[in-house]
A protein has these predicted regions:
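Aromatic- and carboxylate-lined catalytic core of secreted/periplasmic carbohydrate-active enzymes
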Residues: 6-23, 465-547, 554-567, 633-658, ...
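Active-site clefts of carbohydrate-active enzymes
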Residues: 190, 238-240, 338-353, 424-463, ...
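Aromatic-lined substrate-binding rim segments of carbohydrate-active enzymes
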Residues: 171-239, 248-260, 366-376, 594
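Catalytic-core region of carbohydrate-active enzymes that cleave or remodel glycosidic bonds
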Residues: 256-257, 366-382, 399-486
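Beta-strand-rich binding/interaction modules
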Residues: 37-42, 46-74, 84, 99-104, ...
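N-terminal carbohydrate-binding accessory modules
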Residues: 108-186, 524
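Polysaccharide-binding and catalytic clefts of secreted carbohydrate-active enzymes
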Residues: 267-398, 422
Length: 795
């Protein structure tokens, strides 16, 4: 900083605390209605001889800068705080549009002496001008055209999460214009935990909030950016009831809030809806987990669910769940959740069913609220639910929720080792998956210094963006546009593109690069061809509390992407059907341990159509340990044994040779292998006896996957470890995505439209390229060295 700047900073500090605030009483007024502004001047510790202003000057201009009102406002009150209201009475009714009000106290002996706020005169034509948002298998579409989302989360850069209670449309318009210039094409915002501030009692909604939301939507529309609005966070409000998902009073209150808000925007396609942020099924004390709530509504719903699934014969249920208690139909106790070496009084098979029950409860709740929103806002309004990575575990899962939503969403925060997997297991083939709240938590070293440099943070965010598209995602919504310095938690108080001083982090460049790439690529994109490989998520194993849960799927996704340039479609075992497997050449079922009869039947039907099915590890039966007809027909049932620390395998060595794999982390105490030697890939059902996905060594699993891909006739792009890659084929273009997780620059070889090319990928960065169908010519590419022909070495 130069000397004058430092001097100005010191002088301002010596002036002491002072604040001039101006806000509209209602941020949106109707045509012909006068806007009212409240001006507040605070001087917490006035100096003895100084004169605190008792009047402020107000100038209102339209959006072109033309003055439409000038006046003054009397400020009354003690010297420490004075306030007043001014009505904007123009010579004639103000036409629809955004207006900017500058408030000045020029005689104040301190700074700031001026502030600018804004308000809207409702513009019905602008609200009605929105694009028609729809969804297809892979994309969110705008008036029918593919729009890869490059979005952000935005509340406000001045008051942040208080933005709908302390509105300033002038600031919003400045920030939205900045976003538009950067290429942002969707903004996510909402209430999160502030729902109680707008409606404590069902039906009694705060009109000032609605007026502010009108202004926010109008400002977004003025800048051509659609809004996704979130209602709740973590748990829905119970409104005095016992269960937020099942209680009638809870559902009544939720219906009232959603109806009162959404009906205001009937026919307004600039806004659509996100039901709840990162939900759990749990009591308030158990957020971020999946636990019984313990109320009567839950008990009744559980009994009805069990009766529909198994009947209500206590003898049958005792046998099914190994439950000898006096109340086999009772909800599992919280202390039954989780794995232990000794079963004690726990009933893991019953817990497995309870977890499936909670998934169904939340999915039904989401479907109910989606129906309410469609009745209120219109049948074509889009509805999603922003779940975090807990949806890949036992919390409400995107794979199960998908039928209740228009598109799924995943918040990619913590799983930095498995970012591609995050997207794969949360995307269903029928609907788009949007990566929301993609950002970086803070990390510190032993002395509290930042773990990442600004440039390494930028590189990680770039990999997150690229992995979203590699996972067939519909786009990325970054968290958040502005750093929120008011956050009391250090972990969150530094997240965002733009710092409180107005400067931008290098991370912001990521959004611009991807926005520019997809602006050129979008006309060539459409829904992609189905993936030839399907990965089955063993949800029964996860819900039964088995160690390592679905970790086997992480290893498969990483190795397929890095070593073979193949990324699978993932399907939940609980939603597996033969029709969903119709396009698959290869179905991988990694270490399932137990498989429902419905899923086994789908696998059997697929195998009889010619699809190859690869299953690893022991399969004991269905989730209740019973043999089933389809498992018998697949030839998967055979009594196995616990793995030993070292097991022999024929994979990864020459024919007739033997390698050894290691099962550590006490796997010898909870993991079994099937009998027999390494599988021969004959027929259509292949059962590898070893759960190789959970072994320490990688190469045997790489060899097994490679042999399975070859036998199934799946095209691959083999490469050493470290750079994940895939090709996504649309009718007019082929999207290539490469992500380098190594510290060295690399060249990833891919065969595109018959042309072998080497794609340069910088260390810890990514490359996206769009190739023309038929010719393999590069149409668009993210910045980097040129692609070269692998045979000739030329561009």
């Amino acid at each position: 900083l130069d000397a004058p700047t430092i001097r100005a900073i010191v002088e301002r500090a010596l002036e002491g605390a002072a604040e001039l605030v101006a806000r509209p009483v209602r941020a949106t007024v109707e045509p012909g209605e006068n806007a009212i502004l409240r001006v507040t001047l605070e001087r917490p510790v006035p100096r003895a001889a100084e004169v605190v202003p008792d009047r402020a000057r107000v100038t209102v201009r339209d959006d072109s800068g033309t003055p439409v009102f000038t006046g003054t406002v009397d400020l009354v009150g003690p010297r420490e705080m004075r306030s007043g209201l001014v009505a904007v009475r123009a010579d004639k009714a103000l036409p629809p549009g955004l207006y900017h009000a500058r408030v000045e106290t020029p005689d104040a002996p301190w700074r700031p002496r001026s502030v600018t706020t804004g308000f809207w005169v409702r513009d019905a034509a602008l609200l009605a001008s929105g694009p028609r948002l729809t969804v297809s298998r892979d994309w969110i579409r705008r008036d029918g055209k593919v729009v890869p989302v490059i979005g952000t989360t935005y509340m406000a850069s001045d008051v942040h999460r208080k933005f709908l209670f302390e509105p300033n449309p002038h600031v919003w318009d400045r920030d939205f214009a900045d976003m538009r210039r950067e290429g942002i094409n969707l903004v996510r915002t909402g209430l999160w935990t502030a729902w109680s501030r707008i409606m404590l009692d069902p039906g009694a909604v705060d009109e000032s909030f609605l007026s502010a939301l009108d202004a926010y939507v109008l400002t977004a529309a003025k800048n051509g950016i659609p809004v996704c609005f979130n209602f709740y966070a973590f748990l829905p409000p119970a409104y005095g009831d016992e269960n937020p998902y099942l209680g009638p009073r809870a559902l009544e209150g939720q219906r009232a809030l959603l109806t009162l808000v959404a009906s205001r925007y009937r026919g307004v396609s600039w806004i659509h809806w996100d039901l709840i942020n990162e939900p759990s099924y749990a009591p308030p004390s158990g957020v971020w987990s999946n636990l019984p709530i313990g109320d009567r509504h839950e008990a009744e719903a559980w009994r009805a669910w069990v009766k529909a699934k198994h009947g209500d014969d206590p003898l049958v249920l005792r046998d099914l769940w190994r439950d000898g208690s006096s109340d086999p139909l009772g909800v599992p106790r919280p202390d039954e959740i989780g794995y232990r070496f000794l079963r004690d009084e726990r009933h893991p098979r019953k817990v497995r069913d309870f977890f499936e029950f909670t998934q169904d409860v939340v999915a039904a709740w989401a479907a109910r609220l989606r129906g309410i929103l469609r009745e209120a806002a219109g049948s074509d309004t889009l509805v999603t639910l922003g779940q975090d990575e807990g949806g890949t575990g036992t919390r409400p899962a995107q794979q199960i929720l998908a039928d209740s939503l228009d598109y799924t969403a995943i918040h990619t925060w913590w799983n930095n080792d498995d970012l591609l997997w995050d997207g794969v297991v949360t995307k269903v083939p029928e609907k788009p998956d949007l990566h929301q709240e993609t950002g970086l938590m803070s990390l510190e070293d032993i002395d509290g210094a930042p773990w990442r440099t600004p440039r390494s943070a930028e590189a990680l965010l770039e990999r997150k963006f690229a992995d979203a598209f590699a996972a067939r995602g519909a786009g990325v919504v970054e968290w958040a546009w502005n750093v929120n310095p008011y956050q009391p938690e250090d972990n969150e108080a530094t997240i965002g593109f733009n710092r409180p001083d107005g400067t931008a982090k290098p991370e912001r460049d990521v959004a611009g690069r991807f926005a520019r790439f997809f602006a050129e690529a979008a006309p060539f994109l459409d829904d992609f061809e189905p993936d030839p490989v399907v990965l089955v998520i063993p949800h029964s194993r996860l819900f039964a509390g088995r160690p390592a849960g679905v970790d086997s799927t992480k290893r498969v996704v990483r190795l397929l992407g890095e070593r073979y340039g193949v990324v699978p479609t993932a399907l939940s075992e609980l939603r597996l059907g033969a029709e969903r497997l119709r396009a698959a050449r290869l179905v991988i079922v990694p270490t399932p341990e137990m498989v429902t009869e419905d899923a086994a039947r789908a696998l059997l039907e697929a195998s009889r159509r010619g699809t190859k099915v690869l299953v690893t590890g022991e399969v004991e039966g269905d989730p209740y340990g019973r043999p089933t007809p389809s498992l018998e027909a697949l030839g998967l049932l055979a009594e196995g044994r616990p793995v030993t620390l070292h097991e022999p395998t024929g994979w990864g060595v020459p024919p007739g040779g033997r390698a050894w794999v290691t099962f550590d982390s006490l796997a010898t105490q909870w993991l079994k292998r099937a009998p027999g030697e390494s599988v021969r890939l004959d027929g259509n059902v292949w059962h590898e006896p070893l759960p190789l996905e959970l072994a320490v060594e990688t190469e045997p699993l790489v060899a097994l996957l490679g042999a399975a891909l070859e036998a199934a006739g799946v095209a691959t792009n083999p490469a050493p470890a470290g750079v994940a890659a895939r090709l996504l084929v649309a009718p007019r273009g082929v999207l290539a995505v490469c992500v380098n997780e190594t510290p060295v620059d690399a060249r990833r070889r891919m065969r595109v439209e018959g042309r072998a090319v080497d794609i340069p990928v910088p260390a810890q960065r990514s490359r996206l390229l769009l190739f023309e169908r038929g010719t393999g010519r590069v149409l668009v590419a993210t910045p980097g060295e040129p692609v070269t022909d692998a045979r000739r070495g030329g561009p």
